[in-house]
C-alpha cells in the first residue's frame, strides 16, 4: 500500500478547496473531498480525469454524523489521515440590523461548528500520523465590519484555531489558520458580482495552504493572512 500522505478537505468541490485538492493530487498525494452537491463532486472528479487518488464524499460539514462518516470513509479507503482542511463555509451577505435571520443558523453551523466537528472526528487519526489541521478563515476574522455576521463567524474560527493549537500541540499535531482577503470564488455568487479592486485566485490561496501543510516535521505555521495588493483592510 502506498504511503503517500492523505488529506481530507471539506467543501472541496469548488473554489479554494478544489484548488487545494488539485495541488495535492499533482504532488502525488491522496485526497478526499466532501461537499453537499453530488453533481458538483462528480463534475470535479471528471474534470481531473477521475484519478485513483481522489475520493469524493457527499455530506454536510455541519452534520456530526456525516463528518464522522467522511473521516471513517477516508481511513477505510486510504488507511491513514495526515491533514484535514476545514474549508466549507459561506456568507449570507447581510447585516445583524437589517438582514434575514432565516439564513443565519446554517451559516453559523457551517462556518463555526463545522471546523470543530472536523477536528473532533479526525483528532485520533491525526495523533497517529502527527498530522496537521488547517482552518480556512478570513481577514473578516481580524477586521471589524459594521453589522457583519459572517465576519463574526470568522472571528470564531480565528479563536478556534488558536484554542485548538494550544490543546493538540502536545500530541504533535500542527494547526494553521489561513485567512484570505478578497478571492475570486463562488463565495460572491449571491452578491450580484465580484467586489471592486484586485482579487486573489483560489489557486494562490491553495499555494499558501499547501506551503503550510508541507513544512518540515516539527515546524508549525500558525497564522497566514493573505490579501491582494491594494486591499486596505
Q: What is the predicted role of each segment?
A:
Residues 13-15:
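Conserved glycine-rich cofactor-binding loop
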Residues 39, 58-70, 101:
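The beta1-alpha1 cofactor-binding region of Rossmann-like NAD(H)/NADP(H)-dependent oxidoreductases
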Residues 95-96, 100-105:
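Substrate-binding pocket helix/loop in short-chain dehydrogenase/reductase
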Residues 119, 153-154:
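Active-site helix of classical SDR
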Residues 119-120, 162:
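A short, exposed helix-loop element centered on a Lys and neighboring polar residues
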Residues 138:
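Residue(s) in the substrate-gating loop at a strand-loop-helix junction
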Residues 170-173, 177-178, 194-233:
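C-terminal helical subdomain
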Amino acid at each position: 500500500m502506498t504511503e503517500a500522505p492523505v488529506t481530507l478537505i471539506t467543501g472541496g468541490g469548488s473554489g479554494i478547496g478544489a484548488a487545494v485538492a488539485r495541488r495535492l493530487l499533482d504532488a502525488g498525494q491522496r485526497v478526499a473531498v466532501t461537499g453537499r452537491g453530488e453533481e458538483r463532486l462528480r463534475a470535479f472528479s471528471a474534470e481531473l480525469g477521475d484519478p485513483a487518488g481522489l475520493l469524493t464524499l457527499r455530506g454536510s460539514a455541519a452534520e456530526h454524523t456525516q463528518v464522522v462518516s467522511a473521516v471513517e470513509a477516508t481511513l477505510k479507503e486510504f488507511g491513514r489521515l495526515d491533514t484535514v482542511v476545514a474549508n466549507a463555509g459561506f456568507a449570507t451577505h447581510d447585516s445583524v440590523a437589517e438582514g434575514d435571520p432565516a439564513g443565519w443558523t446554517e451559516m453559523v453551523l457551517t462556518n463555526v461548528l463545522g471546523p470543530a466537528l472536523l477536528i473532533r472526528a479526525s483528532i485520533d487519526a491525526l495523533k497517529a500520523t502527527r498530522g496537521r489541521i488547517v482552518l480556512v478563515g478570513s481577514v473578516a476574522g481580524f477586521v471589524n465590519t459594521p453589522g457583519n455576521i459572517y465576519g463574526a463567524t470568522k472571528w470564531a474560527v480565528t479563536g478556534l484555531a488558536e484554542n485548538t493549537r494550544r490543546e493538540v500541540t502536545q500530541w504533535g499535531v500542527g494547526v494553521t489558520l489561513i485567512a484570505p482577503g478578497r478571492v475570486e470564488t463562488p463565495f460572491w455568487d449571491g452578491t450580484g458580482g465580484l467586489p471592486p479592486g484586485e482579487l486573489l485566485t483560489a489557486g494562490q490561496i491553495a499555494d499558501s495552504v499547501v506551503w503550510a501543510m508541507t513544512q518540515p516535521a516539527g515546524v508549525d505555521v500558525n497564522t497566514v493572512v493573505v490579501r491582494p495588493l491594494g486591499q486596505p483592510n
